Each structure stands twice: as structure tokens, then as C-alpha cells.
Amino acid sequence: MRVIRAPAIGRAHELVVKMILEKGRVLQTEDDEATVEFEEVALQVDTPLAGPMVSPHSRFQQRFVEQYATDLLHGSHASFEYDYHGRLFDWGERLSVEGVPVHVDQIEYIAEKLKKSPVSRRAIAITWNPVIDEQLDDCPCLQLVQCTLRDGRLAMRVIFRSNDMLTAAGANMYALVQLQKSIAGRLGVPCGTYTHISLVPHIYYLRDMHDIEPFCGKGEFIQPVQEVCRACGRCPRAKTV
């Protein structure tokens, strides 16, 4: 597993995009989309609320990520196959125990667990629901959230089974850090380290070609692998690789 340490989540976003584009391998997904992917990666940010929280190279800027965070924390009226708010704050759809529907507020559980046992390693939330997700075409990428209290600070670790690091990870990190801040506020402590683990980090290099260009800077900031560079073809380097 590669570890990327950065002073802010916006910078972590830039560094992981660079790593995947320069060192990744190209393959077609089971949905027949052209991707470049890399081995497991952990993005570690000791000061997650420090700026920049959003990379200036990302298409999705402050207004978008703030709305995304609001939807995760408070829910949305939009209709999706799943949403992270429901999975974290009301887990258990279609499940029942002795005829009683399951409704688990996992974020409440995390906060209460750490209030009662500040050294606990059990303050976790999961999103996967096999009853639903094994049948979905679009199933949750975020799988697990763990919070720990160490040295008077709330650390958060998240695990993604798969993560679109170009167009999704920036908003994912921003929203989850807002969740970390919210839980820390309930406990009356500051935020500690935020660690974002992706088991299969990837970029859809054909679908999102226009999103790659601002990060790449026509080869000035990033020198992508041959297949990506040739597919783009927007700078002189594409003709030489």
C-alpha cells in the first residue's frame, strides 16, 4: 500500500491524481469503461480542516462540495440507488429483527461509544448491505468509517472498496471531513488526522479527459502513462510518448 501524506485534503487530491496518472495501469472495467488504476493507497492528512480543502484544478469547487457535504450529513430529496446519509444515519433498509424493521443511526453510535469509552476501537460505521448491494449496478464505494480518540483529538479513517480519484474523491474527502468535524463537535474535541484509504484507486481517463487536463497542465505538472497521454493528444508530449 502506498501512503501519501499531505498538509491538506486539496493537496492530497492532487498528489493521488498525479500518482495514478503517472504510475497506473490501464484496463477496461466490467462496465467496459477505460480506466487507469493503481494499487491500494492511503491519503493521510494531519490537519484536515486546513486549506486548501478543494484543489483549484478540480471541476467541483466550493459550492458543489459544500452541497455534497450537506447531503451526506442531512440527507437529500434526490432519488438514488443508495446514498451515504441513509447508509450512515439509517442503516438497515429491508432488514428486520423479529419482525421489527432495522434502523441504525451509526453516527450516533460512534459518538456515544466514544463518550462512554474514549479509548474504544469499536466506533465504526459500515455502508454495505448485502440484501441490497449484491443486486445493484451502482453500489456504495465507501465501505467503512472508523473514529478514534487519541491525544484529545478525533481521528477518522475511511475505507473505499473502489474510488474515482479524479472526479469523486475530492468531494468524498471534503464531506467526510465535515462528518469528522461534526462528530468531534459532539464530543467537544478538535479534529485529528483524517486517513482516506482506497483499495482500488482509479481514474476514468476517456470519460473524464477534460477533467484531467487542468491537473496535468499539458504535461507541466503531470506526465501521464502513454495510453492516457495519447488518448488526450492536447499537448506536444502526446506525439512523443
What are these regions (language model features)?
Residues 1-241:
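Terminal, non-catalytic protein-protein interaction segments that mediate quaternary/complex assembly
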